[in-house]
């Protein structure tokens, strides 16, 4: 889990973030704003900590986890800094998808978002100092009863244009 999720609750910070988010209203209007940040690098110690955590939860798996940890360390040593950045950023989207599914299950509205300045978010949230970089956003809450968009039908590509069977 090479990422961290920041919940931004400070209204002044959210105003600053909105200004560098193409003025998307959800940044300030949603009751909760989550910024999914990827780690810019992963250390051997962090991998060891993760393996210890997994071993403490899944007793009897320690030997397999040591091998898996070594595999991860060796794989990551082969990555350039840019490859590491891209890989960890992709991991945030897996967490984002889980959060969106959880919101749907709980019947809570949410809006996964991009369209913001990563550099400015990192500056405003001081995330770079923690070895993090903003990757994606999730605005969460209940829509306003006057929200005109709630009555619009969702537009999606036809299934036959979206999926292709490869045989």
Regions found by a protein language model. Name each.
Residues 1-167:
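Acidic, surface-exposed loops and disordered segments
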């Amino acid at each position: 889990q090479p990422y961290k999720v920041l919940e931004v609750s400070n209204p002044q910070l959210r105003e600053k973030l909105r200004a560098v988010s193409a003025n998307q209203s959800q940044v300030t209007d949603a009751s909760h704003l989550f910024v999914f940040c990827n780690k810019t690098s992963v250390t051997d110690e962090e991998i060891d900590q993760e393996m210890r955590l997994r071993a403490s939860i899944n007793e009897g798996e320690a030997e397999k986890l040591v091998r898996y940890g070594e595999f991860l360390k060796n794989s990551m040593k082969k990555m350039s800094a840019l490859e590491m950045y891209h890989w960890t950023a992709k991991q945030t989207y897996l967490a984002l998808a889980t959060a969106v599914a959880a919101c749907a299950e709980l019947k809570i509205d949410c809006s996964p978002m991009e369209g913001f300045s990563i550099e400015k978010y990192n500056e405003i949230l001081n995330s770079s100092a923690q070895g993090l970089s903003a990757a994606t956003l999730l605005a969460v809450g209940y829509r306003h009863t006057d929200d005109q968009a709630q009555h619009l039908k969702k537009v999606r590509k036809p299934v036959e244009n979206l999926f292709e069977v490869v045989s």
